[in-house]
């Protein structure tokens, strides 16, 4: 029967530890991306929920009208604007013009240049329908595509300057900047609640309110 010496056992253990460490370092980034890709909507919601609670905003989640194929992930009723937010996840970089039907997409570790649908087009279509159905002034709205932090973006603004592509990590600050920079009066609170109820009425969801300051 062959027996290992103490030194050989130590070498074997160290070799196993080194192999496992190398394997972990190689697989961890891939595993992290898979986990993030599957849970990105929850991460986005946590940031939006923090904004709503901290600023005492109103929030409708998962706005859907199946007959018109309308799907808005979050509707934030802030002090000066109503934000229609759609969640998107990209692994790489995107660029394009606001009028393009598709954006150019450069996935990580992929030399092929691909295309993805321009998220603004569907969001604008849903926005137009919501304005029509709810009877709310279109000037009260801002449109937001919410993306993951590690995607690179090169997309021009639309002429109305009411469309924004914002990363999860910058959402709170950018919403605050939009609100602070806008040269319009705050919503009347009763009118804001009415607008939220009008939109909730054509959905089938309730309205969530942040805490009082």
Regions found by a protein language model. Name each.
Residues 1-70, 77-83, 88-97, 103-213:
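Surface-exposed interaction regions that form or flank ligand-binding interfaces
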């Amino acid at each position: 029967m062959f027996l290992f010496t103490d030194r050989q056992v130590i070498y074997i253990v160290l070799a196993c530890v080194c192999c496992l460490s190398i394997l972990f370092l190689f697989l961890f980034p891939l595993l992290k991306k898979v986990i993030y890709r599957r849970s990105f909507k929850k991460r986005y919601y946590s940031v939006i929920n923090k904004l709503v609670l901290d600023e005492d905003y109103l929030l409708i989640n998962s706005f859907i009208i199946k007959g018109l194929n309308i799907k808005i992930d979050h509707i934030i009723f802030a002090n000066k604007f109503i934000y229609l937010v759609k969640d998107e996840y990209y692994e790489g970089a995107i660029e394009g013009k606001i009028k393009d039907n598709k954006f150019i997409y450069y996935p990580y570790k992929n030399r092929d240049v691909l295309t993805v649908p321009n998220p603004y087009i569907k969001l604008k279509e849903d926005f137009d329908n919501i304005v029509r159905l709810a009877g709310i002034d279109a000037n009260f709205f801002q449109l937001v595509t919410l993306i993951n932090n590690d995607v690179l973006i090169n997309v021009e603004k639309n002429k109305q300057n009411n469309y924004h592509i914002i990363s999860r990590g910058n959402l709170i600050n950018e919403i605050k900047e939009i609100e602070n920079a806008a040269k319009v009066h705050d919503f009347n609170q009763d009118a804001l609640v009415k607008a939220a109820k009008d939109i909730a009425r054509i959905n089938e969801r309730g309205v969530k309110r942040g805490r009082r300051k």
